[in-house]
Amino acid sequence: MEIFGIIDYVVGWAVVAGIYAIFSLGLNVHWGYTGLFNIGVAGFFAIGAYTSALLTTSSPTPALFEDFKFGGDLPNRLGSFNAGIDLWFLIALIGAAITAGIMAALIGLLTIRLREDYLAITTLGVAETIRLIFHNEKWLANGSRGLYNIPKFLGDAVDLSLIHIS
């Protein structure tokens, strides 16, 4: 196994660990400072993740995935406006934050007067409903087959084929 494959593997795990660290910080702020256990954070995390993925993936070929309707394809739509800085990634993050924030505000308005156990039960139901929607609705997120071909941020910044020359 090449050293660059190992480094790529470690970096991938570090990114996943960073994402879950941010998730746990959000849960800690809510549960730690207010004492209210809110499992709905996982659902809003999923909404943000799927929104950013849906904005950046390209639409699949209809012959294979006829039910899947979305695919923003931001990297190709921005084209030269991208300016070499992966502007699509920033737009996808902003879109994900806005979408998750709007959904969290709507659910928050419905659950604002609930206390402790009832809030935990309600937000568990919300998070599970969101998970099941993304898992089962083929038109939204390709159902149980999941999303694929999600572009990497700064994915082609380094040409690894040139590393073998040195």
Regions found by a protein language model. Give the residues of each.
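Transmembrane alpha-helices and adjacent helix-loop boundaries
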Residues: M1-S166
